[in-house]
């Protein structure tokens, strides 16, 4: 397989990481997470592109635009995980292998966070490992892509 390209999508309020509820989400900023992923992507020999939006439609547009450009999607839809049929449907429509990640363990939080519209259509879900959830998700996604060829 040639060098795979991965789209990393960050959902609403993730731009506030580092200052937003550090007891839940930790003190690592989104910029630091992206830097860590860039370093990991280099060692995994993949290309990576980042996009963050607080707007559902923009995330849907990014998913649709990934078709033909990216081999995989690493997504933290944040609060949209629990509410967005549109993001779920966009992921299903493009059928690009995807991994869902969350900083916190969504199943140890409020009841409304226990349901993910995204989980049934992605390869897998990683949650509860803080910023490392992203790294674990990227490793799993690349492994999946390499073993499917």
Swiss-Prot record:
Annotated family: Belongs to the type-II 3-dehydroquinase family.
SUPFAM superfamilies cross-referenced by the UniProt entry: Type II 3-dehydroquinate dehydratase
Site annotation Transition state stabilizer: residues: 20
PANTHER family cross-referenced by the UniProt entry: CATABOLIC 3-DEHYDROQUINASE
Pathway(s) where this gene product acts: Metabolic intermediate biosynthesis; chorismate biosynthesis; chorismate from D-erythrose 4-phosphate and phosphoenolpyruvate: step 3/7
Self-association state and partner proteins as the record states: Homododecamer.
InterPro entries reported in the protein's UniProt record: DHquinase_II, DHquinase_II_CS, DHquinase_II_sf
Name of the protein described by the UniProt record: 3-dehydroquinate dehydratase
């Amino acid at each position: 397989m040639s060098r795979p390209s991965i789209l990393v999508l960050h959902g609403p309020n993730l731009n506030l990481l580092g200052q937003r509820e550090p007891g839940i989400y930790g003190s690592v900023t989104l910029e630091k997470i992206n830097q860590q992923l860039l370093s990991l992507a280099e060692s995994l020999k993949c290309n990576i592109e980042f996009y963050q939006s607080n707007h559902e439609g923009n995330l849907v547009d990014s998913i649709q635009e990934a078709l033909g450009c990216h081999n995989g999607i690493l997504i933290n839809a944040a609060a949209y995980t629990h509410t967005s049929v549109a993001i779920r449907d966009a992921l299903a429509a493009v059928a690009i292998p995807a991994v869902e990640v969350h900083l916190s363990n969504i199943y140890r939080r409020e009841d409304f966070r226990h349901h993910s519209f995204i989980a049934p259509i992605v390869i897998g879900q990683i949650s509860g490992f803080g910023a490392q959830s992203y790294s674990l998700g990227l490793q799993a996604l690349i492994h999946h892509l390499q073993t499917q060829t």
